[in-house]
A protein has these predicted regions:
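Short amphipathic, basic-aromatic surface patches that mediate peripheral association
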Residues: 51-65
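Short acidic/polar inter-strand loop motif in beta-rich domains
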Residues: 83, 109-118
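Contiguous beta-strand segments within globular domains
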Residues: 40-54
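Short, compositionally biased P/S/T/A/G/V-rich stretches that sit at domain boundaries
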Residues: 19-41
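Short strand-turn-strand beta-turns centered on an Asx-Gly dipeptide
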Residues: 75-80
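Short, well-structured beta-strand segments within conserved domains
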Residues: 46-50, 98-111
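N-terminal signal peptide c-region/cleavage motif recognized by signal peptidases
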Residues: 13-15
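Short beta-strand segments within Ig-like beta-sandwich modules, predominantly Fibronectin type-III
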Residues: 81-87
Length: 132
């Protein structure tokens, strides 16, 4: 029984179920980019602004055939996928910021849940939020 518990803890601690580790798709020119800005919310958590260039958010196409530089965003906090994002603003509740240093990451995803890449590297933006 102890062996089983250790395996379960390892699986959950590596976050095996948080995203689709499937296919990667090279982007086409003009190459998309993503940058993040985060601001403390006056009530709870943080407001995230996602600055996108050359990328179309298309929630109506998710699950359909891939199109160049079109899809959705995946939002991760501390390695855990917390949402699909379909706009440039997103509110993240404080409960996700439980560490002293919290890693926020956004990736560009295809309609069929793959990750867009440039020269084999996932197109993403990462920032660290420090809890005081």
């Amino acid at each position: 029984m102890r062996f089983f518990i250790i395996i379960v803890l390892v699986l959950f601690s590596t976050n095996s179920f948080a995203h689709h580790p499937g296919h990667k798709v090279e982007v086409a020119a003009p190459f998309p980019s993503v940058n993040l800005e985060i601001m403390k919310d006056s009530v709870d958590g943080y407001n995230l602004y996602i600055d996108l260039k050359n990328f179309n958010l298309a929630p109506d196409l998710v699950g359909k055939e891939n199109q160049s530089n079109t899809g959705y965003l995946s939002l991760y906090v501390n390695g855990i996928k917390i949402a699909r994002v379909y706009s440039q603003w997103f509110h993240i509740p404080q409960r996700f910021f439980y560490l002293k240093e919290n890693l926020v990451k956004v990736t560009l995803n295809t309609n069929l849940n793959g990750e867009f890449t440039l020269d084999g590297e996932t197109i993403q933006s990462v920032l660290i939020v420090i809890n005081n």
